[in-house]
Amino acid sequence: MGAYRYMQKLWRKKQSDVMRFLLRVRCWQYRQLSALHRAPRPTRPDKARRLGYKAKQGYVIYRVRVRRGGRKRPVPKGATYGKPVHHGVNQIKFARSLQSVAEERAGRHCGGLRVLSSYWVGEDSTYKFFEVILVDIFHKAIRRNPDTQWITKAVHKHREMRGLTSAGKKSRGLGKGHKFHLTIGGSRRAAWRRRNTLQLHRYR
């Protein structure tokens, strides 16, 4: 087995003495830093490489801190208007994952870079920490490589804002297997429309 396989096994056993100590120390370290900062190198090189990261020019790692918990509706003094069914303020759950929120914040901060993917690096009772892989699409090492040319296309501008990253697709219910059967046909809306449209085919 290679070194990355051993690292993968270590990260899978998060309750082991080694990982509990490491995660505790790292969470303390991340709390002292700003909510969004550049990391000198990936904390999990095995995971980063699986998601497409390469240790060469053009790739950047940003670490993002996201506050845990639900999303309170931003209304003044709880004044919501309309029917009582829409009066909720406190127990509202956000439609997307905290990981996709972290990607969005990194993408906003680094507008000239493209978000490739992200991964979890730690959490405590208040925060979750993610590392986001960003790509400089104007770097020659990215533009001239056939494997990475796809992300330089204009259609991938701010892909994290439109649910095109891995975390974003998961929140949209897109994927393979029986867990994702509600989005057969492209999206939840497309699947619903197809199931609820009456088609009377002409008898021939």
Curated annotation (Swiss-Prot):
Keyword Cytoplasm included in the entry's annotation: yes
SUPFAM superfamilies: Ribosomal proteins S24e, L23 and L15e
Keyword presence, ATP-binding: no
Keywords noted in UniProt: Cytoplasm, Ribonucleoprotein, Ribosomal protein
Pfam families: Ribosomal_L15e
Protein localization: Cytoplasm
SMART domains the UniProt entry points to: Ribosomal_L15e
GO biological process, alphabetically ordered: cytoplasmic translation
PROSITE patterns named among the record's database cross-references: RIBOSOMAL_L15E (PS01194)
Any single GO CC term annotated in Swiss-Prot or TrEMBL for this entry: cytosolic large ribosomal subunit
PANTHER family associated with the record: LARGE RIBOSOMAL SUBUNIT PROTEIN EL15 (PTHR11847:SF4), RIBOSOMAL PROTEIN L15 (PTHR11847)
Family statement drawn from the similarity comment of this UniProt entry: Belongs to the eukaryotic ribosomal protein eL15 family.
NCBIfam families the record matches: PRK04243.1
Function: Component of the large ribosomal subunit. The ribosome is a large ribonucleoprotein complex responsible for the synthesis of proteins in the cell.
Subunit architecture: Component of the large ribosomal subunit.
UniProt protein name: Large ribosomal subunit protein eL15
Species: Tachysurus fulvidraco
